UniProtKB/Swiss-Prot annotation:
Protein role: Binds directly to 16S ribosomal RNA.
Region (Disordered): 1-23
Basic residues: compositionally biased ranges: 7-20
Key word Ribosomal protein present: yes
Top-level division of the source organism's lineage: Bacteria
Pfam families: Ribosomal_S20p
Protein name: Small ribosomal subunit protein bS20
Entry keywords, A to Z: Ribonucleoprotein, Ribosomal protein, RNA-binding, rRNA-binding
Transmembrane residue ranges: none
Length: 92
């Protein structure tokens, strides 16, 4: 338990930051989930539209340090790969 006033303030700030960051992480997961749902439904246009909306959010959270930049790159790469495979399957 924090005893000094500065430690109490830091604990309060950390708790506020933790809850805010949790909200932002949840938002990223929701955007990713929307892309995955469209991919699972084999809807290439909807998947591409959801991906275009998700990329700036993923990048912004990586810039803020909410998620690691490599994790952001991994998500974007894998989602884009699935969309490309979906488009190839539709074209074939």
């Amino acid at each position: 338990m924090a005893n000094s006033p500065s430690a109490k303030k830091r604990a309060k700030q950390a708790e506020k930051r933790r809850s805010h960051n949790a909200s932002l992480r949840s938002m990223v997961r929701t955007y990713i989930k929307n892309v995955v749902k469209a991919i699972d439904a084999k809807d290439a246009e909807k998947a591409q539209a959801a991906y275009v909306l998700a990329v700036p959010v993923i990048d912004r959270m990586a810039d803020k340090g909410i998620i690691h930049k490599n994790k952001a790159a991994r998500h974007k790469g894998r989602l884009n790969g699935h969309i490309k495979a979906l488009n190839l399957a539709a074209a074939a």
